């Protein structure tokens, strides 16, 4: 016997709807997101399982505390795409009405009738999940760093554009310069001797110090004093925030590298020809996970990463378009792998150049190369084996010879 649960999660209270195999309602409840609320619900789930009832749950998000809770209680979890849920709502309503209990009911019924089209969540090991959280938080810090750099750039352009020529804003040199000389007036008051002293203290070469001195002495458009005062205050605030975020990005990078180095998967994933490039390899493995049978085939992996297009057929029409629905984080890291391999892999460079020669722009050519890499990465992941460039080149040569032979026979 099996019960189908629909869970519409929320920050405070989760709506739950339960139906049996015939679609008859078994129960519905609101579960407070508290220790007591989840504990009470957990007892109910355990009682059902003790009676020999199999529990399947549909939920919109594939991770989080509620998902962990359900897995801990032996519930099979099926993540449902929000777009699929939105379309399923129309089966049960004539209007656009919406509520949390209604969504929970739709999830339960959708799982009961369409579970053959869904894939049960295959949780990775705790180590893989921890690495995934680390890499996700790292990317959040990188995005925050980018936002602050953009804000700081816009602020300096408004009153102090010469300061942008000192160095990249993510460097300590640029931020220390801005803190020491926050306005054009402060720079104008500098003597060359004082500047040389500051440059030596910050380990600038004589040539670079002279170049910057000439740059800072060039006049800029006058800016009203009240604008300078306001923008200088904002600039110093942004510099403090950016300094903290830059430090956090570096700390996360070190933590990810150290954590990943202790995992067995590092021995094969680091053999990809991408060089020692930051967190690319750890992020790739974290997104792949280590749950058995998570990826059914390399085609499944390609579709999830969005490296292959979508084909739409209707009558005599056939349209091939870009795949928008995919794991954006995985798409990005596969693009990174493809790009970094251009300077490290002979066949990757040749394939990319071939795509460009056919008229494809950089992004489509890189995406096509990423699709090729995912075929290789799937085999590496499935068999836990390292990458061998020479073996792959030999395999490609045999395939090309076989294809030529088939053409001659034809």
Place the predicted regions along the sequence by residue.
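A detector of single, family-specific signature residues
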Residues: 1-410
């Amino acid at each position: 016997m099996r019960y189908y649960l629909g869970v519409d999660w929320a920050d405070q209270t989760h709506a739950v709807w339960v139906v049996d195999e015939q679609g008859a309602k078994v129960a519905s409840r609101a579960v407070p997101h508290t220790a007591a609320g989840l504990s009470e619900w957990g007892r109910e789930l355990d009682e059902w399982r003790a009676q020999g009832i199999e529990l399947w749950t549909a939920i919109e998000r594939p991770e989080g505390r509620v998902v962990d809770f359900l897995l801990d209680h032996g519930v099979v979890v099926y993540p449902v795409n929000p777009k699929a849920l939105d379309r399923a709502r129309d089966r049960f309503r004539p209007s656009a009405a919406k509520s949390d209990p209604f969504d929970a009911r739709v999830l339960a019924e959708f799982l009961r009738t369409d579970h053959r089209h869904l894939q049960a969540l295959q949780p990775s090991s705790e180590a893989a999940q921890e690495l995934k959280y680390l890499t996700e938080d790292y990317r959040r810090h990188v995005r925050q760093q980018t936002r602050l750099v953009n804000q700081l750039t816009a602020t300096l352009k408004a009153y102090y554009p010469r300061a942008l020529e000192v160095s990249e804003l993510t460097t300590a040199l640029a931020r220390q310069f801005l803190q020491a000389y926050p306005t054009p007036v402060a720079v104008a008051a500098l003597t060359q001797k004082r500047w040389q002293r500051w440059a030596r203290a910050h380990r600038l070469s004589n040539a670079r110090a002279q170049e910057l001195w000439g740059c800072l002495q060039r006049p800029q458009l006058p800016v009203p004093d009240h604008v300078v005062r306001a923008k200088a205050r904002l600039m110093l605030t942004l510099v403090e925030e950016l300094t903290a975020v830059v430090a956090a990005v570096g700390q996360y990078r070190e933590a990810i590298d150290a954590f990943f180095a202790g995992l067995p998967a590092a021995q094969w994933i680091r053999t990809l020809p991408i060089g020692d490039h930051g967190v690319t390899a750890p992020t790739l493995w974290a997104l792949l996970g280590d749950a058995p049978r998570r990826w059914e085939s390399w085609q499944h992996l390609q579709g999830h990463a969005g490296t292959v297009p979508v084909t739409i057929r209707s009558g005599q029409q056939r349209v091939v378009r870009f795949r928008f629905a995919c794991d954006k984080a995985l798409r990005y890291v596969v693009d990174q792998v493809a790009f970094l391999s251009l300077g490290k892999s002979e066949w990757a460079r040749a394939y990319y150049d071939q795509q460009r020669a056919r008229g494809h722009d950089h992004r489509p050519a890189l995406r096509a190369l990423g699709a090729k890499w995912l075929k290789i990465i799937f085999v590496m992941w499935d068999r836990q084996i390292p990458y061998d460039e020479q073996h792959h080149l030999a395999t490609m040569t045999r395939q090309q010879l076989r294809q030529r032979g088939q053409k001659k026979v034809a």
